[in-house]
């Protein structure tokens, strides 16, 4: 399935709207996400996993397994540096993924994993992620078809033109992607 990440949730303060889609598939072993982005400005300062990738040109996937109280966040900048964790909320009971768990997430990006300051111009880029399902389902084997509650995001907090896009609308006064109450639902066949 292909989804458009096109909700500009805070248009008065952050009207920027790059073109963003994400294609989602699974092979019963892993979830595959292929983000396609076209927009102005490109930034990739963070090169290490579990660093502030959201400040760069970044795509994100937050998901919640049915019946779970918490959710997971996967955030990846345009050069493949990632943040990943399980959590109850933005700041509550955060359990960052270990280096081994992060290493199991396959990443393919348009740009090599080399830092660069913000560049002006029009850029098209992709990030492809392959996330093992046993990581998402915390060691349990999912039964297919399987539903996931989730949202897809695009952000770039520290660029000249910050933006905060989502697939599902977020009805909050300030940018915050850590809000499972606004997740939509996808089905893994």
Model-derived features: where do they sit?
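Structural preference for beta-rich elements and adjacent junctions enriched in aromatics
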Residues: 1-189
């Amino acid at each position: 399935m292909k989804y458009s990440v096109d909700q500009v949730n805070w248009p008065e303060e952050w009207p920027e709207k790059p073109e963003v889609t994400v294609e989602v598939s699974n092979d019963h072993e892993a979830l595959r996400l292929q983000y396609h982005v076209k927009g102005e400005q490109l930034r990739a300062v963070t090169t290490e996993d579990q660093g502030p990738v959201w400040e760069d040109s970044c795509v994100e996937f937050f998901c919640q397994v049915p019946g779970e109280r918490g959710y997971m966040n996967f955030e990846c900048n345009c050069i493949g540096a990632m943040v990943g964790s399980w959590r109850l909320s933005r700041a509550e009971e955060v359990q960052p993924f270990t280096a081994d768990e992060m290493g199991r997430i396959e990443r393919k990006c348009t740009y090599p994993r080399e830092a660069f300051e913000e560049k002006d111009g029009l850029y098209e880029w992709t990030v492809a992620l392959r996330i093992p399902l046993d990581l998402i389902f915390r060691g349990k084997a999912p039964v297919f078809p399987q539903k996931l509650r989730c949202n897809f995001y695009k952000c770039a907090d520290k660029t000249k033109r910050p933006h905060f896009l989502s697939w599902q609308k977020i009805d909050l006064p300030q940018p915050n992607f850590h809000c499972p109450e606004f997740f939509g639902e996808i089905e893994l066949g």
